[in-house]
């Protein structure tokens, strides 16, 4: 959640001044999965409530994240940029990420979050009931 909020505060709200809505394309697994209460609670409290945004999250099912336009356009370029090079430190990884570009001029911006996150954070049923969540009618399989 820190990265989404940081992006909104440093880039998004300036680039999209009158935006009241944010769409996030997310992989279906990991910490931002569609079943993650921590992810949903964080989006509501840290992005929606704090910044007055409505957020739609489109989760890609397992094995389909390659259709995410960012992954589709950038990951192959990142892989080519750091191919056969030892990724032996965060600084090295960030260097290769930041120097990746596409032929159309798309660039990668990357920063390291050094925050130590707590493990086992639980969001209660009561906390979930407070959230303003709506599932889309069409949820393709």
Task: Give the ranges of each region predicted by the language model.
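Short, basic/hydrophobic alpha-helical segments
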Residues: 1-24
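Phosphate/oxyanion-binding active-site loops and adjacent basic polyanion-contact surfaces
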Residues: 1-6, 32-39, 86
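Extended hydrophobic secondary-structure segments that form protein cores and membrane-embedded regions
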Residues: 21-28, 57-62, 96-97
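Acidic, metal-coordinating catalytic cores used for nucleic-acid/nucleotide bond scission
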Residues: 26-39, 61-67
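Short secondary-structure boundary/capping segments
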Residues: 38-43, 73-77
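Two-metal-ion acidic nuclease core segments, chiefly of the RNase H-like superfamily
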Residues: 39-57
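RNase H-like two-metal-ion nuclease catalytic core shared by retroviral integrases
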Residues: 57-79
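C-terminal accessory extensions appended to soluble enzyme cores
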Residues: 84-141
